[in-house]
């Protein structure tokens, strides 16, 4: 036997905000047709309890512009009205069932629709929402099966995803950090080893200069030795005279 989940709703002139309060759903199916008939079914829990809904909305809707988000705690729908006007009720029936309640947290009075708060509420939960149109052929909303596409993350090949990360070429450029291997170029600081060669060349130059000085000293010494006998010869000549 199926059960009925709690349903909350609010409206603006152009939209209906519909929340099916049901956590951790499986095999979730949603269908919305242009006449405003909303069908929902899902399984919950280890025993796969079945929850179902069939709501005949107060007026026609624009399925293609409507959106849905299947979350962990609830299923949130933004249903676009076919004609922009206040319905003042959710269903065609005079007395709604006990599980259908007004969502006062999202309710916006007609006079307040242009306010920033109303705009924020309109955008709430929009991130990650899929269109209800073309959702798998479930009457316009059948596309909601496409919401399985949301679950499609489960079927995503993460190796390809990571490969795509490689596509963040700049990140691949981190291989350039291998260029940090270029820090090995700091080994080029080994070229600073060239500083040692530079110092050696200085030493050699100084040694060479020192050797030159020694050679000069030896030459001067030789000259002095050569001049000495001449002096002696002069002395002996004088003595002979």
Swiss-Prot record:
Stretches the record annotates as Disordered: 188-241
Triggers of expression: Inhibited by heat shock treatment.
CS domain mapped to chain residues: 2-91
Cellular component per GO, a single term: plasmodesma
Family annotation (SUPFAM superfamilies): HSP20-like chaperones
Biased composition (Basic and acidic residues): 207-224
Matching PROSITE patterns: CS
Amino acid composition bias (Acidic residues), ranges on this chain: 196-206
The protein's role, per its UniProt record: Acts as a co-chaperone for HSP90. Controls root development through the modulation of auxin distribution in the root meristem.
Subunit structure: Interacts with HSP90 in an ATP-dependent manner. Interacts with HSP90-5, HSP90-6 and HSP90-7.
Name this polypeptide is given: Co-chaperone protein p23-1
Taxonomic placement: Eukaryota, Viridiplantae, Streptophyta, Embryophyta, Tracheophyta
Gene designation: P23-1
């Amino acid at each position: 036997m199926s059960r009925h989940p709690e349903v909350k709703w609010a409206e603006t002139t152009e939209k209906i905000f519909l929340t099916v309060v049901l956590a951790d759903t499986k095999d979730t199916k949603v269908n919305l047709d242009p006449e405003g008939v909303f069908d929902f079914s899902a399984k919950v829990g280890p025993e796969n309890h079945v929850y179902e809904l069939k709501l005949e909305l107060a007026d026609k809707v624009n399925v293609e512009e409507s959106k849905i988000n299947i979350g962990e705690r609830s299923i949130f729908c933004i249903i676009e009205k076919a004609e922009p006007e206040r319905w003042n009720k959710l269903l065609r029936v005079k007395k709604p069932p006990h599980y259908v309640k007004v969502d006062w947290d999202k309710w916006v009075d007609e006079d307040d629709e242009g306010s920033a708060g109303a705009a924020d509420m309109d955008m709430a939960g929009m991130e990650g929402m899929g269109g209800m149109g073309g959702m798998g052929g479930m009457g316009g909303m059948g596309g909601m099966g496409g919401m399985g596409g949301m679950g499609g993350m489960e079927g995503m090949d993460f190796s390809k995803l990571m490969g795509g990360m490689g596509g963040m070429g700049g990140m691949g450029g981190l291989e350039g950090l291998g260029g940090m291997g270029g820090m090995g170029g700091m080994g080029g600081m080994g070229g600073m080893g060239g500083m040692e060669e530079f110092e050696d060349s200085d030493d050699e130059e100084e040694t060479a200069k020192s050797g030159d000085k020694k050679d000069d000293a030896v030459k001067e010494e030789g000259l002095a030795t050569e001049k000495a006998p001449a002096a002696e010869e002069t002395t002996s000549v004088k003595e002979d005279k």
